[in-house]
């Protein structure tokens, strides 16, 4: 869940006192912090999560707006959607389920308004549908949202959860009283508190999946949590932006050695159905499956699109995630534009993900040999999204659209060949110029003519024949050029052609699809086949008049903590700087960046910059504004003591404006930075 304590004074006595792990630590809370009877009882055997858990978590869609009806309706939806039959089991509550105080005996209790029948009844409802109930707590004095924490009540809370029939316990890392642990580093405190919680859960005698949500990667939970838990967070909370998905994926790249049956790296809840489009959701789901990550859906299961349901219930992809070997994927190659990830499966197959990180269609390739497969005359390449198998001589390649992934299951063919069609690839490369020199953004304009190159390649063991390649586009787009043909395309060779594509003069903003289609024959001409791929051309139109940035769609946005928020602060109220509230603006937490397309139409930007008043005098950031990659404003270090910066910068002729928020060199805690009333002055048409 998102932790307000990262930005407010909810964490009391937070002391940065080192990060070295002491190998031998006491396994219970200090007596001074533990009421009588709170020593964890002798532990029984630990529950084992042989494969990563699958289920649902409410936080990223509902936050604190949770209740009994939501949980029960979600359980019903998990059944009716086919998710239960696909392997999803856990229905997990996050923060805000509890009453604001414990009962007279010091026990946790569910909020009587949100859960009028109590948590035991909710658990019974979930169990009756063949599902399991998960719940949330915190090792600190309060949860991240300010509800009663487990500090000093660990065994009692574990017993309470067991008595309710809880099956999964997620324990967060907020409001930790570090002052009660003199001489210990934060990492040592984490090990101490979470070990005590692990013992308490085991001592109940009820198998409960233990999820550690110690969200500070500086404490390296992957080095100590495997011994005491079933999964552990490897990063901070994130949002549904593509860049944040990539950041969490990158965090996992060096951590494969720490995961395995019974203990899993947790890159956070799934954002499937919340991403910018279905392709991003499929790529995200592919990546989490490759990571052997917990598959905890974070969308509203009661109201999801057919595409979202199809993504979440793709059994071939789920089988990769749930592979019994439990070996997390490793990254074979990495650039800013593309990744290749490899995962070894229990039967010796390799799962291969070709991930396009960038904003344009890219050909990505590897080989069966590079994936670690034994030498063979041919390989079966199973596309886990298209549900089709092809035969390859060894190349594993695809033309992957922007923000997308191709996911394959690859195995050697025992007899060197099979009855599969040859693996082929079609690529389309519209050569759209950058928005400005050196930019990664490629934008087409109305009336512009774009040279587009398309190709068709044969990666199979034998040649294909009677090949023809053509390019088509949207209605109203002019395409000059004829289909290209060849009597045969041998293995490892390509057929290519060039077309001139003209964007209509009256086109509106959006992403437009160019399709390359190849027809051919295989199997000594006995079988006809078609292969195609799509590439998008992005058309943007700059703003007009005097809009606020917060009323426009950004090109990209990254944030150090959760998503960039529009016209509100983290806590839902207005942006506020030094007592002045603002109706319009952007809330960020360092390190953050936001880009907007201007198209050369705007002449100036005005804004008020400063730390949000919610951080109560803490935090420090820097602001930097650039136009087409050229710096036009630098704030220097900004603290709560710095007067509000009233910015007025020129933008004449700029295609793109970018605002960066830095951490001023002292970390990102409390770095809630507002970009208030950010207003453009642009041409009227």
PLM regions and their residue ranges:
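Short, surface-exposed loop/turn segments at beta-strand-coil junctions that are enriched for proline
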Residues: 502-508
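Short beta-strand elements of extracellular/lumenal beta-sandwich folds
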Residues: 348-354, 446-462
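Carbohydrate-binding surface patches
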Residues: 288-291, 296-298, 334-373
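Secretory targeting and sorting signals
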Residues: 1-35
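Glycan-recognition surfaces
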Residues: 153-156, 202, 206-300, 321
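C-terminal beta-strand-rich structural cap/linker in extracellular carbohydrate-active enzymes
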Residues: 392-422
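Gly-Asp-aromatic-enriched flexible segments
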Residues: 538-685
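Aromatic-lined carbohydrate-binding/catalytic grooves of carbohydrate-active enzymes
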Residues: 74, 78-184
């Amino acid at each position: 869940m998102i932790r307000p304590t990262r930005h407010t004074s909810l964490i009391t006595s937070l002391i940065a006192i080192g990060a070295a792990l002491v190998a031998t630590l006491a396994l219970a809370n200090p007596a001074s912090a533990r009421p009588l009877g709170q020593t964890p009882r002798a532990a029984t055997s630990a529950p084992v999560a042989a494969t990563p858990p699958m289920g649902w978590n409410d936080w990223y869609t509902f936050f604190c707006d949770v209740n009994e009806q939501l949980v029960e309706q979600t359980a019903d939806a998990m059944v009716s959607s086919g998710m239960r039959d696909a392997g999803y089991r856990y229905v997990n509550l996050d923060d805000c389920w509890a009453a604001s105080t414990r009962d007279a005996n010091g026990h946790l209790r569910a909020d009587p308004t949100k859960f009028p029948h109590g948590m035991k009844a909710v658990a019974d409802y979930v169990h009756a549908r063949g599902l399991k109930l998960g719940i949330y707590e915190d090792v600190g004095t309060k949860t991240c949202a300010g509800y009663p924490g487990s500090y000093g009540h660990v065994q009692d809370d574990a017993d309470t959860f067991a008595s309710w029939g809880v099956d999964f316990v997620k324990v967060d890392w907020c409001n930790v009283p570090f002052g009660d642990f003199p001489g210990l580093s934060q990492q040592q405190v984490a090990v101490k508190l979470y070990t005590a919680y692990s013992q308490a859960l085991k001592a109940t005698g009820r198998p409960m999946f233990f999820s550690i949500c110690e969200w500070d990667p500086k404490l390296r939970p992957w080095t100590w949590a495997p011994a005491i838990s079933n999964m552990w967070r490897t990063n901070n909370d994130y949002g549904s932006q593509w860049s944040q998905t990539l950041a969490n994926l990158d965090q996992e790249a060096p951590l494969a050695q720490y995961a395995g049956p019974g203990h899993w790296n947790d890159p956070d809840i799934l954002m499937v159905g919340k991403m910018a489009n279905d392709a991003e959701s499929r790529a995200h789901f592919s990546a989490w499956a490759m990571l052997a990550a917990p598959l905890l859906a974070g969308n509203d299961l009661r109201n999801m699109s057919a595409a979202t349901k199809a993504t979440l219930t793709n059994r071939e992809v789920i089988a990769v995630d749930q592979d019994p070997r439990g070996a997390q994927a490793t990254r074979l190659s990495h650039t800013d534009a593309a990744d290749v990830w490899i995962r070894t499966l229990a039967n010796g197959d390799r799962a291969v993900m070709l991930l396009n990180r960038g904003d344009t269609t890219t050909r990505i390739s590897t080989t069966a040999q590079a994936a670690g497969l034994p030498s063979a005359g041919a390989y079966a390449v199973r596309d886990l999204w298209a549900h089709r198998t092809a035969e390859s001589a060894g190349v594993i390649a695809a033309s992957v659209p922007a923000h997308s992934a191709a996911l394959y299951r690859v195995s050697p063919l025992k007899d060197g060949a099979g009855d599969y069609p040859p693996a082929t690839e079609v690529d389309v490369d519209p050569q759209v110029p950058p928005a400005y020199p050196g930019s990664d953004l490629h934008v087409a304009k109305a009336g512009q003519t774009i040279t587009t190159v398309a190709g068709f390649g044969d990666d199979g063991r034998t040649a294909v024949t009677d090949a023809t390649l053509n390019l088509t586009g949207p209605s109203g787009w002019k395409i000059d050029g004829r289909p290209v043909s060849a009597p045969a395309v041998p293995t490892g060779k390509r057929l290519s052609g060039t077309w001139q594509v003209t964007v209509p003069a009256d086109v509106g903003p959006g992403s437009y699809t160019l399709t390359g289609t190849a027809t051919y024959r295989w199997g000594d001409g006995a079988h006809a086949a078609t292969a195609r791929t799509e590439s998008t051309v992005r058309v943007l139109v700059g703003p007009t008049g005097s809009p606020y940035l917060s009323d426009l769609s950004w090109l990209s946005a990254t944030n150090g903590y959760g998503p960039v928020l529009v016209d509100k602060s983290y806590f839902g109220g207005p942006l506020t700087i030094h007592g002045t509230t603002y109706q319009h603006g952007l809330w960020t937490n360092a390190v953050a960046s936001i880009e907007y397309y201007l198209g050369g139409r705007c002449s100036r930007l005005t804004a008020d910059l400063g730390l949000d008043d919610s951080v109560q005098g803490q935090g420090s950031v820097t602001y930097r504004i650039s136009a087409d990659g050229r710096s036009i404003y630098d704030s220097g270090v900004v603290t709560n003591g710095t007067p509000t910066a009233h910015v007025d910068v020129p933008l004449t002729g700029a295609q793109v404006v970018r605002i960066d928020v830095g951490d001023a060199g002292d970390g990102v805690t409390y770095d809630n930075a507002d970009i208030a009333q950010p207003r453009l002055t642009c041409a009227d048409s």
